[in-house]
């Protein structure tokens, strides 16, 4: 799904926000540091400025095959090119009878619209000649619509909101700032000045697509996410994070902007100008979820600096009129002999709780909820939530994976549901944006893995199927 050098395609899809499993004999000790070669690499060489497309003057509508007044007609020849929207990532659907579809194929198709950074509303008329079960993702696999069942010949209209970002931003003094991207982020769909939609599932199909910039009077709140690889938009299967599943649980009216990145600590998130970009654009009425711990615990004597930076994040966000919310870090897949989760995070979740108390900030205790959930799953059941795969399970997975920190789609989805439960349980102000049709999740009663399904996003090029060094997963 991304255009990355072969060396980084899968190695940095993981990027090890923390090593897999700390020794159960010393639950307070941080896990061993990953091999030096597996650590995140900041991109070097000449910095190429992002080419920003012209702003949309208003709503733009695309229709499949059938001409419609005021709309752009899509054909198989409508390919993404420069500032022109079109089919992307070497996929082209079948277009017939006013419907764009992948009938009879298990492969998704992608459509991209070059746009400047900002928030956008997307409206889709979904459904085709055949009965469909459609999943829609945006950008780097952000889950938007999940297994939407549509009858044969029927059409269902769905609306959702998407954030688009680029590395460049304007500082408060008017000078130009730029996020220091890691090598794995170069070419990533989350940084490329276009809005990309993935149509997946069984017989995915749509009839019309409308995109509208949410500016001026139509501007709406944004939920900014700051964190590490357990929150990032993981762009390559089978990795996933709770941050990229979260948009599925919100109604139109709020946009999730996931600035989390693999390998980040509070210190590096600050130093790489990631927080600077957020604080340059966050506005009154916005929200800010922050979760760090897995990498911070690797910093020698890092706790005082962690507390200082996290407190400063809260102070700066609040000064801009936005609402900060602290999220404690989820546990690893580390059980003791009695079936209880080991504490492998060296006191950082408790530090997060104390910061929330000291600053009178909302708290989502994902650490506590994940402990309850993983223990309810049991050791064998919890394996289904983490990156535990046999060789050959996915393209490029040439060796067994035994990663006890990072999640697959199922684990990430369950954790995202824990987040929504935490919002509701503490009646946080962002609760009003949750989809009321989504049940209130109970961490003590997690979903059954065998009943869970999200369609697989295939790699777009050979570089996404490189061998994963086993040393990176221990």
Residue locations for each model-derived region?
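Structural motif
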Residues: 265-274
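Compositionally biased, intrinsically disordered or flexible polar/acidic segments
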Residues: 22-237, 397
